[in-house]
Design a protein with these regions (language model features):
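Juxtamembrane interface at the cytosolic side of transmembrane helices
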Residues: 209-239
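Extended, hydrophilic extramembrane loops/domains of integral membrane proteins
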Residues: 159, 163-203
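Surface-exposed patches in mature extracellular/periplasmic domains of secreted proteins
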Residues: 139-144, 206-211
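Soluble non-cytosolic domains of exported or imported proteins
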Residues: 31-38, 42, 117-125, 181-188
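Gly/Gly-Pro-rich "capping" loops immediately C-terminal to redox-active cysteine motifs
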Residues: 56-123, 141-170
Length: 239
């Protein structure tokens, strides 16, 4: 609980980190699409968890995505053999500081941290754009830069899927120089699925909360009608 409160305290600092001036695209995904969430979980485990952890999420929570315990153990668990374990990164923080200069942030609530009070869902849009905006930059230590987050220390972990983009300095737009294993539309869909998982992970009960909210509103509406009818019946003899 102490670590979780600290993460919430520092989340706004992550949101205000150095960002570029690129146009932020609208995330086309949804947390109600179980197939997208399952694919996003697979991408997260295979690509993101090499450096980033999700230390406030347990592997058993992935069962809520419609996966069986066997599927989770066989396809999504590489750093632990217990489904009740937290989704921690295998590398130690001191090793990561040595490699990257700073330990990569935990991603459990990154989708919420990247939003803001005026647009809490904006974190999904930012992540969707950021993960598609890496380009080759020989002046950076990793060989990569990002149109959304200038001089970011993170390399392009998905370049095998997307390929290698370069900056056209005349148009200030990115162009695909070396194709990846996925077509551009397929890559965009994969990133959307990954963001779906990140959004779900930041608040796993959001779909239940929304559904429950509609039931509560419906109950209050019925209660209002009953209360109004009772009020009229009670006061008719007085008036």
């Amino acid at each position: 609980m102490k670590k979780f409160l600290i993460a919430l305290l520092f989340a706004p600092l992550v949101a205000f980190a150095n960002t570029g001036t690129a146009h932020i695209d609208k995330w086309p995904g949804s947390v109600s699409d179980k197939a997208a969430l399952q694919n996003g979980a697979k991408l997260f485990v295979n690509y993101c968890m090499n450096c980033h952890g999700a230390s406030y999420m347990r592997y058993k929570n992935l069962l809520d995505l419609g996966l069986t315990e066997q599927q989770v153990k066989e396809n999504l668990m590489f750093t632990s053999d217990k489904i009740g374990e937290l989704m921690r990164v295998a590398a130690r923080s001191d090793e990561q500081k040595l490699w990257f200069g700073a330990a990569p942030p935990d991603l459990t609530i990154i989708a919420r941290a990247r939003g803001d009070a005026g647009n809490p869902a904006g974190g999904a849009d930012w992540l969707y754009t950021y993960l598609r905006s890496f380009y080759r930059d020989a002046n950076r230590p990793t060989g990569w830069n990002n149109l959304v987050f200038e001089n970011v220390g993170m390399p392009h972990i998905l370049y095998g899927l997307q390929g290698q983009q370069v900056m056209n300095h005349e148009t200030h737009k990115l162009e695909l120089a070396v194709p990846g294993s996925l077509a551009p539309a397929e890559f965009d869909k994969s990133v959307s699925d990954l963001v779906s998982f990140l959004v779900w992970m930041a608040e796993p009960q959001q779909e239940y909360r929304r559904t429950l909210g509609w039931f509560v509103l419906a109950f209050l509406a019925v209660l209002f009608v009953v209360a109004y009818a009772l009020k009229k019946e009670y006061w008719k003899d007085i008036h």
